[in-house]
From Swiss-Prot:
Biased composition range(s): Low complexity: 357-367
Function in brief: ATP-dependent serine protease that mediates the selective degradation of misfolded and unassembled polypeptides in the peroxisomal matrix. Necessary for type 2 peroxisome targeting signal (PTS2)-containing protein processing and facilitates peroxisome matrix protein import.
Subcellular location: Peroxisome matrix
InterPro entries named in the record: AAA+_ATPase, ATPase_AAA_core, Lon_lid, Lon_proteolytic, Lon_Prtase, Lon_prtase_N, Lonp2_euk, P-loop_NTPase
Pfam families registered for this protein in UniProt: AAA (PF00004), Lon_C (PF05362), Lon_lid (PF22667)
Main localisation: other
Domain Lon N-terminal: 15-296
Family label: Belongs to the peptidase S16 family.
Name of this protein: Lon protease homolog 2, peroxisomal
Residues the entry annotates as binding ATP: G519, P520, P521, G522, V523, G524, K525, T526
Gene Ontology MF, one: ATP binding
Length: 1004
């Protein structure tokens, strides 16, 4: 028959079972982490039955006596159960069915996975995580705390939920969600009222609430840090289900949330037992709703009782009031004495068996002092240290925090060291160890639609982000959220609990990519990161790295220094409240502006080098902040970085990230962004939508605003100018006594009224000629600026006379760099070679060429205050020198870019898209670019990958026609200097010789 019975397909024979002790009040539920503490010898005898099956068992039994070999049947049962109900982890595990009291003749329990165990002293701590409900068949041993192999029937909720109709699925979502929302509001109201009643200025009725033992018990439970963290996670999960689909997966998620909620809340043992024994999922949801309503009724009863006592209290005189208060104090003292006298419970044979967490044992003097302590914050630190091992903190951190707490408990409260250590613990308790916000179900269509709605264009960026979303959807193994038992049972956790982190679970975590968005200011790099955080359901944190010059800003200061604090990365985790947020490292190129070896770098460290560990997926799971002092796991943090220029960044840092270039927008794209995004935003921000007027701009007005009033790669200036137009319209509306409706169109003639006169157009400067200057020797080149934008440069060459030695000399000015000066030398040699070999000639006589060879020339590039460098001006300089030699002017609407060689080859250059955008804005009519940049032009012409491949395969160069229509100017390729000359003077006959004679043939 196999391991699973054929009648229901869920019965497992010979499954290890453990009958819980009656007085433990433990009701195991799926998804909850429990710590079982039993006598060591007895516990080792039980765990010895599973020796060799799981790493946790073998680790706990190290050094213990030999045990019998595990029966093959038990190992086979474990393997079969894992494959069917816990297949997410391939590591062999141990499972035990925790059995509770019998109800209606049936024993029901929860199958749990043994995740950790540790022996210390005479006790053994066993950590168990509930997985699924199960019904145990007869017979069941009569003695408690006994282990036996019995027949269990697994209650698989998925099989029953699969038979539900739409009405039941909707009830599952609405029932759990509605009950949770009401209870969440009720808990918030109760804690707020209780806190206000503790203040000195509260009225008498409010103070009476603190005298209720039930109110104090509830407030103590709700104010525990473990409960607050777990409840916050549940609240986040429930908010994610607000708009969830009415399907089977949502219903299963709601059942899991119900289990976690009942386990977290201070419900009674009878309520938890009733909830555990609800086999039918539909009945379980009804039970959940009823229990939540009962807890709300408890709050209402407390409020009504407080009001009743207050009304009766006011009718008594001062003596009666004093007697009532004295009775309260006397009862409290008697209760404290009883706690001190109580001994820990023992099972048969004097063996201590208990479930943790529970109050500290009465035979411990330190525990008694702690119970009587008035320092609630110190008690909170003690509780945190006791529970630190189940929070996923690194082993080094666990050891260090326990050592620091022992030191803290021995220090005087007034000492400086005490205050420093207290501040340190306050910060550590704020780090959200073990808290991961689960990624909601990924809808690729909705995600793509959101990215398109938030950003215009950016095709490559959206493509890469959708690839990452597909990986997440396929893997679907982001860290889950489970509540630990420290937030479930009453009392404080024990420092004996130790969790051995499962290595296989660590390996299943999806490695997140590190994306570096590079582009000019204002193109949407930061807003893209925000949109991705919304799509992934991750909390967003932004860290501005501009001006950071100290390594301690990243790694933190060592806490021995006065005023020490943690670094930006750990602080971002604290603000996010989880260990898997999306952190944006903004302007990462600015943090590396200090040259290597500079004084500041030596004194304060290199913050760029500190980022190497943060952005390395092989290292950041053990990132160490100097203030924290132990490794912090950053492996599930999604880092986005932005930069304007990569030239100042170190290669190792860039190599750790995937670089995505975001280019500047064309003016058509800017108009589309302004019309569909920016103008509606400004209308909304300035409340112009309340006027009922439909504001718009004409096409000519849009073009004028984009071309004349804003010269940038991004759209920030455009946003400001549109805001000025909207505010101007608001002034008109107010001056017209708040009257007006219908459409209001801003024309090109209206723009100076709102924006003033446009800045003087650079286009006029570069195209106009002077009356006394020669027209030849002037060529327009294209440049790529450090801010990611393009520009148009003017290369002017004039003949200032004959040189002294009758040889051609060229003087350069205009703040030219080394590479650009070398391009001038290369261009000079090339032109001299072509003219000397008569490859190019001007007329029948060569007087102009002869004059050129003995000339003293001067080459100048205007705007001398701006440094200029790079190889892409070689083609333009060569054409300018040839224009001077031949005395042939070049069309002022022509612009050139490309690196020139001594053989006349024109090599590809970078920033072609930005250069063409600049040429378009300056009104150029023809742009000549290297043939090697065809891929760049194809990407500029089309966004679709398939269309790009088709264009590249077409020898007719169809992308040039597309670009002419898109940019409004002609674009042509140039492979060598000959192509450049023929495009510059297309009407000149016989300007370039075919040169069949090898003695004069140019080596091209």
């Amino acid at each position: 028959m196999g391991l699973f019975g054929k009648d229901r397909g869920e019965r497992i024979a010979e499954f290890p079972c453990y009958l819980l002790e009656t007085g433990t009040h433990l009701v195991p539920l799926p998804g909850i982490l429990y710590n079982l503490v039993i006598e060591r010898t007895y516990g080792e005898r039980i765990l010895g039955q599973f020796r060799g099956i799981g790493e946790a068992v073998d680790g706990a039994l190290t050094g213990a006596g030999e045990a019998a070999e595990v029966p093959g049947r038990v190992a086979e049962v474990m393997k079969a159960f894992q494959e069917r109900y816990d297949s997410g982890d391939k590591t062999q595990a141990v499972y035990i069915c925790l059995v509770t009291e019998a109800a209606a003749g049936r024993h029901i329990g929860c199958i749990a996975r043994l995740t950790g165990a540790r022996a210390e002293g005479g006790e053994l701590s066993v950590l168990l995580r509930g997985l699924v409900r199960a019904v145990v068949g007869q017979p069941v041993p009569s003695r408690r705390n006994e282990m036996w192999n019995g027949s269990v029937t697994v209650l698989d909720d998925a099989q029953r939920v699969a038979t539900w109709g739409a009405r039941q699925l909707d009830f599952a979502r609405q029932g759990v969600f509605g009950a949770f929302e009401e209870l969440d509001a009720g808990i918030g109201t109760f804690t707020a009222r209780f806190k206000s009643s503790q203040k000195r200025g509260a009225d008498g009725a409010a103070h009476l609430l603190t005298l209720s033992p039930l109110a104090n018990t509830l407030f103590f439970h709700f104010s525990r840090s473990s409960f607050e963290r777990s409840w916050k996670i549940l609240r986040t999960m429930m908010h994610g289900f607000r708009d969830a689909k009415k399907d089977i997966r949502t219903a299963m998620d709601m059942l899991s949330v119900a289990d976690l909620t009942v386990g977290l809340l201070p419900t009674t043992t009878a309520q938890r037992l009733e909830f555990l024994q609800a086999e039918d999922p539909a009945a379980r949801i009804k039970t959940f709703v009823r229990h939540m309503q009962q807890l709300l009724e408890v709050f209402g009863s407390l409020y009504r009782a407080t009001e009743y006592v207050h009304d009766r209290f006011e009718t008594h005189g001062p003596i009666a009031k004093s007697q009532l208060i004295a009775n309260q104090l006397r009862s409290l003292r008697f209760y404290i004495d009883d706690i001190k006298r109580n001994k820990p419970e023992s099972g048969p044979g004097g063996r201590s068996r208990r479930l943790l967490p529970r109050p500290a044992s009465g035979n411990s003097a330190a525990a008694g002092e702690e119970d009587d302590s008035e320092d609630s914050e110190l008690v909170a630190i003690k509780r945190y240290v006791d529970e630190i091992e189940v929070k996923g903190v690194h082993a080094d951190g666990v050891k260090m925090l326990k050592k620091d707490y022992r030191s803290l408990s021995k220090m005087h409260v007034q000492s400086t060291e005490y205050q420093m250590l207290r501040n340190y613990f306050d910060f550590i308790m704020g780090i959200p160890f073990g808290i991961y916000v689960s990624t909601p179900e990924i809808d690729l269509v909705a995600s793509s639609r959101k990215l398109d709605n938030d950003h215009y264009g950016l095709v490559q960026v959206k493509k890469r982000l959708l690839e990452y979303l597909c990986v997440l959807k396929l893997s679907a193994n982001s860290p889950g959220v489970t509540a630990d038992a420290g937030a479930i049972e009453d009392g404080s956790a024990t420092k004996r609990a130790v969790v051995y982190e499962n290595k296989a679970q660590e390996q299943r975590k999806t490695k997140v990519p590190f994306l570096l968005l590079v582009g000019p200011p204002g193109v949407g790099k930061t807003s893209v990161a925000k949109s991705v955080a919304d799509v992934l359901g991750r909390r967003f944190q932004r860290i501005s790295l501009g001006g950071i010059h100290n390594e301690a800003e990243i790694r933190g200061h060592r806490r021995t220094y006065v005023g020490a604090m943690a670094g930006m990365i750990v602080n971002a985790l604290c603000k996010a409240g989880c260990m898997n947020p999306l952190i944006l490292l903004d302007e990462i190129d600015k943090v590396l502006s200090v040259p290597a070896g500079a004084g500041a770098s030596r004194l304060n460290g290199d913050p760029g080098a500190a980022l190497l560990e943060v952005l390395d997926p092989e290292q950041n799971h053990t990132f160490t902040d100097h203030y924290v002092g132990f490794p912090v796991d950053l492996s599930q943090v999604l880092f986005f970085c932005t930069a304007n220029d990569l030239s100042g960044m170190s290669e190792p840092l860039v190599d750790r990230m995937e670089v995505i270039h975001i280019e500047g927008y064309t003016y058509e794209e800017k108009i589309a962004i302004g019309r569909h995004f920016l103008l509606p935003k400004q209308i909304r921000l300035n409340s112009f939508d309340m006027t009922g007027i439909n504001l718009s701009l004409t096409d000519d007005a849009w073009r004028t605003v984009v071309v004349d009033y804003t010269r940038e790669a991004g759209v920030r200036n455009l946003d400001r100018q549109l805001g000025a137009i909207v505010r101007g319209k608001i002034v008109e509306y107010v001056e017209n006594n708040m009257s007006g409706s219908g459409d209001d169109v801003v024309t090109q003639k209206n723009l100076p009224k709102f924006l003033g006169l446009p800045p003087h157009s650079l286009r006029e400067e570069v195209t106009q000629t002077t009356s006394f200057a020669e027209k030849y020797g002037v060529v327009h080149g294209l440049s790529y600026n450090s801010d990611g934008t393009g520009g148009v440069l003017v290369f002017e060459v004039i003949r200032s006379g004959d040189s002294r030695d009758k040889r051609l000399t060229v003087q350069t000015t205009g703040n030219l760099g080394t590479v650009l000066s070398e391009s001038v030398s290369i261009a000079t040699s090339l032109v001299k070679s072509l003219l000397a070999r008569h490859v190019v000639h001007s007329s029948a006589d060569d007087t102009s060429v002869a004059e050129f060879f003995r000339s003293e020339c001067h080459l100048h590039v205007p705007f001398g205050a701006v440094p200029k460098d790079g190889p892409s001006a070689g083609a333009a300089i060569s054409l300018a020198l040839l224009s001077l030699a031949l005395k042939r002017p070049v069309d002022p609407a022509l612009c050139v870019t490309g690196e020139i060689t001594l053989r006349g080859k024109i090599l590809p250059v970078g920033g072609v898209k930005e250069k063409l955008l600049a040429a378009q804005l300056q009104g150029m009519g023809l742009a000549l670019v290297p043939r090697g940049n065809r891929n760049d032009l194809v990407e500029l012409a089309e966004d679709n990958a398939e269309t790009q491949q088709r264009l590249l395969a077409d020898p007719a160069l169809p992308e040039l026609a597309t670009l002419q229509h898109k940019l409004g100017m002609a674009v042509h390729y140039c492979s060598d200097f000959r192509d450049l000359v023929l495009h510059a003077w297309p009407t000149a006959d016989n300007l370039w010789h075919a040169c069949e004679d090898s003695s004069v043939r140019p080596q091209l």
